[in-house]
Amino acid sequence: MLELVFVIVVIGILAAAIIPRFDRDTLYEASEQLLSHIKYTQHLAMVDNVYDDTNQNWFQNRWGISMSEDDYNYSIAGSGQVAVDPTTGDAINGTGDYNLNDKYNVKIDVAGATGTYNLVFDHLGRPYNGVGTTAVNSLLQNDLVITLTAKNGENVSITVQPETGYTSLGDFVSP
């Protein structure tokens, strides 16, 4: 019995010494979160039944994710409503968990854009791009590259492909 207590104490000491050494990879967490929310936005666009025979512009009701390079946050909205995070039930509105700089100390950079960038998906899942409201008529023609950079200079890119909207995570690059 004494041996069992001794073994438990030793395991407890080792666990207390080892567990604090596991560092969080905040860049990985932020990139996975943004990647999954881009895919979620595309999913919402494809399953949302926005057809309205009384509105000739029904096809312009789209879901989009707006990314701010100034505040390093993002929000998802479409069809007159803000998306709800299925894991937490919170609105994905650019605050709290959706501010990557506050939560993960990570910055967003969208290639070729300044300020707020809108990535919009139509009912077929095709991506449109633009700043402000120009996303309605500008089908994505080239790969869209979103770079996330951690405080230590490490970065990773998320790529959205034209026509299909296929979204992928690139390799992590150290400074």
Each PLM stretch: what is its role?
Residues 56-124:
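Type IV pilin-like appendage domain
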Residues 26-57:
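Membrane-proximal N-terminal amphipathic helix
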Residues 22, 26-31, 167-175:
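Polybasic/polar functional segments that serve as interface/processing modules
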Residues 126-128, 152-175:
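Low-complexity, S/T/G/P-rich flexible repeat/linker segments used as non-globular hinges
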Residues 138-150:
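Short conserved beta-strand and strand-loop elements enriched in small hydrophobics
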Residues 1-22:
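N-terminal single-pass transmembrane signal-anchor helix
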Residues 44, 48-51, 59, 114-136:
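Charged, amphipathic alpha-helical segments
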